Amino acid sequence: MTPAELLAFLQEFYRETSDLFTSRQNTARSVAGYDANNGYQQVIGRQEVHLRWLSDAIASLGGTAADSADQISGTTSSENVKSIIDRDAGNQKAFVDRWTSIVPMITNARHRKLLELILGEMKEHLRILHQAAESRPDVLGRHADGKVLRGTVIAARPKN
């Protein structure tokens, strides 16, 4: 794989990851359950790191990372939360399945390992999304004292 091909490969991976990220940010606004939303915030935080890593890898090859054309909407969906999360998990699984078979073609060990690490974390995110869809109270773990937190979060901070 030539440096130009590697750059194009990384840019495409970045674009698709960025699209998932933007969609997930929109989806998180409709997931009000405390534990499920905390799971979403965990996944979103890791995806921000993935995008930064990819951007750095692209820059090291002399390229620039193009952000998603989609914008984050401030609206929430009235659709059933389980179906929203299931659709999000389905998109993530399709992404992981597609790229898992392609990444081994990268001959640059550093960039191949980076993408393998990102895909591995994205597989773990699927577990979090599935637990969130089930409305499990232990999406991110259990409290040491057995306490179960309940409640909801707001979709966005109120404007003053």
Give the residues covered by each predicted segment.
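Iron-associated oxidoreductase/ferritin-like identity signal
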Residues: 1-160
